[in-house]
């Protein structure tokens, strides 16, 4: 309608209908090749109507084939062809991206499947977010496995990015899920996982052998005992939340990261801490504590947890995620993962395993 009103007021050399040349390109941003082709035909027809109708052009009908209008038709057609090519390319990329996301979602469900919301009397929740906008999985990992020895937990962070980190995370999770049911002692579990990682690194060979190390925390909430055992392999220590008090479970006896222990020859140390009804345990990766605000200050995790001490695991991790996004201005610098475990008040510890036989 605006073109119909403006066309009579413009000189022949500069018809307003020339603006229709851009219509196919505009359509290419949101529609497929067929729709862009239809928009091109519509634009050329409308240009002809504006050029050949006296009431619109304010001139003789013969201007329908004036050289200026003919040039407009040709340009619109060429732009339409270009728009169809661009639209086809965009549609292919969107389909490829959708396929990649689909595969990534499947891989995430296999590698980082959600932990059970409840194991015995324990309530659990997990959080994972990749720093890459289109990524679903990366080098952070977590797992919770109910075993005859109790609930065994793992949180880890693989050095590096990309497929190398994903492959390493997959190998570590596979080793942990199997060994967690077999090894009676937590240090033996960590040692078996590291042995599996060492073997895999040797098989891969190359310069990656000494680079695939993983910081990790192995934790165990045993059956029939009000405590949590921790083996730390160069990872940020777990946090226990109790009646508004926040305490890092760290006695300064961290072992080297996985895949470096054999090189350094240091043993694994297991530390035990009380874990009573009402307590909550948070395991996390350093992507959380190393998140920075606009001024470059690190995220104050312990301070935040003190004000959220009464929240159950699901609400705690949701609040943590939203607060991290707000703190960083919606720009996470690193992958983040967290695992929250709570023993509700009034609930007894996990029941002891029945005697064999």
Regions found by a protein language model. Name each.
Residues 1-6, 12, 34, 43-44, ...:
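Conserved subregion of the PPM/PP2C metallophosphatase catalytic domain
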Residues 1-11, 23-65:
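Hydrophobic transmembrane alpha-helices
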Residues 15-22, 37-38, 70-73:
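Hydrophobic alpha-helical transmembrane segments
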Residues 21-26, 76-79:
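Canonical hydrophobic alpha-helical transmembrane segment
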Residues 48, 52, 171, 175-179, ...:
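Solvent-exposed, amphipathic alpha-helical segments
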Residues 51-114:
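Cytosolic coiled-coil signaling helices that couple upstream sensory modules
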Residues 67-68, 161, 290-295:
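Regulatory loop-to-helix N-cap segments in sensory/regulatory domains
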Residues 102-191, 195, 209:
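Membrane-proximal soluble helical/coiled-coil segments
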């Amino acid at each position: 309608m605006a073109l119909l009103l403006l066309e009579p007021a413009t000189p022949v050399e500069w018809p307003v209908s020339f603006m229709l040349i851009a219509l196919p390109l505009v359509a290419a941003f949101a529609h497929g090749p067929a729709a862009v082709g239809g928009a091109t035909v519509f634009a050329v027809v409308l240009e002809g109507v504006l050029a050949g109708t006296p009431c619109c052009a304010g001139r003789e009908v013969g201007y329908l084939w004036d050289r200026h209008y003919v040039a407009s038709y040709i340009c619109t057609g060429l732009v339409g062809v270009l728009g169809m090519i661009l639209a086809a390319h965009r549609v292919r990329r969107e389909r490829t991206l959708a396929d990649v996301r689909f595969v990534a979602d499947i891989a995430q469900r296999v590698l980082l499947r959600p932990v059970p919301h409840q194991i015995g009397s324990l309530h659990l929740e997990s959080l994972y977010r990749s720093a890459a906008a289109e990524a679903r999985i990366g080098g952070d990992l977590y797992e919770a496995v109910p075993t005859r020895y109790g609930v065994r937990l793992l949180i880890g962070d693989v050095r590096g990015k990309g497929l190398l980190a994903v492959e390493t995370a997959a190998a570590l999770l596979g080793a942990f899920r199997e060994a967690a049911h077999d090894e009676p002692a937590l240090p033996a579990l960590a040692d078996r996982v590291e042995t599996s990682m060492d073997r895999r690194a040797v098989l891969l060979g190359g310069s990656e052998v000494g680079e695939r190390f993983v910081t990790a925390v192995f934790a165990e909430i045993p059956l029939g005992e009000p405590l949590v055992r921790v083996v730390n392999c160069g990872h940020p220590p777990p946090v226990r939340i109790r009646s508004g008090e926040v305490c890092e479970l760290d006695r300064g006896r961290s072992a080297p990261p996985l895949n470096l222990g054999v090189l350094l020859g240091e043993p694994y140390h297991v530390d035990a801490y009380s874990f009573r009804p009402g307590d909550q345990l948070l395991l996390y990766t350093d992507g959380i504590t190393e998140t920075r605000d606009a001024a470059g200050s690190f995220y104050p995790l312990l301070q935040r947890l003190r004000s959220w001490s009464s929240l159950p695991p699901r609400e705690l991790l949701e609040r943590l995620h939203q607060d991290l996004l707000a703190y960083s201005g919606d720009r996470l610098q690193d992958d983040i993962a967290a695992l929250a475990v709570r023993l509700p008040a009034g609930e007894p510890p996990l029941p002891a395993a029945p005697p064999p036989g």
